[in-house]
Amino acid sequence: MAFRAAVASGVAMIGVGAYAAQGSSATANASATIVNPIAITKTSDLVFGKLAVGAVGGNVAISTANVVAISGAGTTVSQPVGNAGNPAAAVFGVTGEAGFTYAITLPSDGAVTISDGASHTMAVNGFVSNPGTTGTLSGAGTDSLKVGATLVVGNNQVPGTYTGTFNVTVSYN
C-alpha cells in the first residue's frame, strides 16, 4: 500500500511539473551597404586680384561667377583696369556616392583673415557657395563647388601680398 501511495504521489508530481511555457521565435536579416566616402579637393584658390587702396578702405566681393563688386561709403579701393590679377572664386571638386546629396559648411564671419606676413591683416567675410548649402553628386559621383567671399580692406591698407587659408567642409545629408 505504501508503494501505491508513493507511486500515485510521484505521478501526481510529474503531472504538475510537466507543463511548459509555449514560445515562438522569428528570424531577421542584418545587412549593411558601404558607400563611397565623400571627399573634397581644392582645384583653384580664391583670388581677390590686385587692388589700389587710398585713404578710405572698402569691401571687395568675388561672386561664385567671378564677378567683382567694390563697395563702401567713400571707398578709394579700385582694381587697375587691365591689371586686375584675374580675380576668381575658389573651385573645389567633390566626390562620393552617385546621386547622394551633401551639406556644405563655409567659414563664419570673423573666422578668416589674410596677412602680409607682418602685422597687417584683412578680414575675409560673407562666404557664399554655388551650389548653396546643399549639393548633389552626379551619376558619376562628382560635383563642382565654387566659393566666393568679401575682403574687408582697411583705410590706408599697407601694400603687400596678403595670404591665408580657409576650410570648406562637405558631409552627406
Regions found by a protein language model. Name each.
Residues 19-106, 111, 139-173:
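N-terminal small/polar-rich segments of proteins
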Residues 111-123:
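Short aromatic-acidic-glycine turn motif
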